[in-house]
Amino acid sequence: MASLKSIIRQGKQRRSDLTAIRNSGKVPAVMYGYGQKNVSVKVDEVEFIKVIREVGRNGVIDLGVGSKTIKVMVADYQFDPLKNQITHIDFLAINMSEERTVEVPVHLVGEAVGAKEGGVVDQPLFNLEVTATPENIPEYLEVEISGLEIGDSLSVADLNTTGDFTIENEPEATVVTVVPPTQGPSEAEIEEVEAGDADTPEPEVVGEKEEDEE
């Protein structure tokens, strides 16, 4: 579990105030949720990124708010790709004994046998819905694919996961599959098309015949 300090924002904030906060390297944020009133705060952007890299997108953070330390998760955040800047964060105060359902990323491990034979690994599901208490939410789910041949697939029911959590997706939902390689036209088909093009008469240029007759 990681810690992050915040500074309470006082009064009503105008757009120019929020811009000034961002230009100073801070991110405007709001904290709300279990047993807490809505509080407007700001946090250091660099420190926030460090914390997320440490605990993951669904990790629990000890957020310092005034004289209190509150356990929170990141409910949402906005990012401006043009400025490469986090523009706002929603912190959700949580009850550590209460289960939550969140999206957890799927990480494929290994190289499929079928991929070595020319097949293509297709991953329909990049995230899975997981229900658990905050401390039991995994940062990601690893799926071993080394033994998959062309035509093989793994569904949610096939996953070998450990931990005190429940995957909410349908058991038959496909997580990953190895599909046959896409085949281009054969040499015979290419030759047939080229022969057809050669037999096609060139279009007559309008006015050419009349000029010859003159």
Swiss-Prot record:
Comp. bias intervals (Acidic residues): 188-202
Superkingdom of this protein's organism: Bacteria
An annotated GO BP: translation
SUPFAM superfamilies: Ribosomal protein L25-like (SSF50715)
Keyword annotations: Ribonucleoprotein, Ribosomal protein, RNA-binding, rRNA-binding
CDD domains: Ribosomal_L25_TL5_CTC
Gene3D superfamilies, sorted: Ribosomal protein L25, beta domain, Ribosomal Protein L25, Chain P
GO cellular component annotations of the record: cytosolic large ribosomal subunit
UniProt keyword Hydrolase, yes or no: no
Pfam hit, one: Ribosomal_TL5_C
Region entry Disordered, spans: 179-214
InterPro entries xref list: Rbsml_bL25/Gln-tRNA_synth_N, Ribosomal_bL25/Gln-tRNA_synth, Ribosomal_bL25_b-dom, Ribosomal_bL25_C, Ribosomal_bL25_long, Ribosomal_L25_dom, Ribosomal_uL5_bac-type
Single GO molecular function: 5S rRNA binding
HAMAP family per the UniProt record, alphabetical: Ribosomal_bL25_CTC (MF_01334)
Subunit text: Part of the 50S ribosomal subunit; part of the 5S rRNA/L5/L18/L25 subcomplex. Contacts the 5S rRNA. Binds to the 5S rRNA independently of L5 and L18.
Role, per record: This is one of the proteins that binds to the 5S RNA in the ribosome where it forms part of the central protuberance.
Family from the record: Belongs to the bacterial ribosomal protein bL25 family. CTC subfamily.
UniProt name for this protein: Large ribosomal subunit protein bL25
Organism the protein comes from: Staphylococcus carnosus (strain TM300)
Lineage: Bacteria, Bacillati, Bacillota, Bacilli, Bacillales
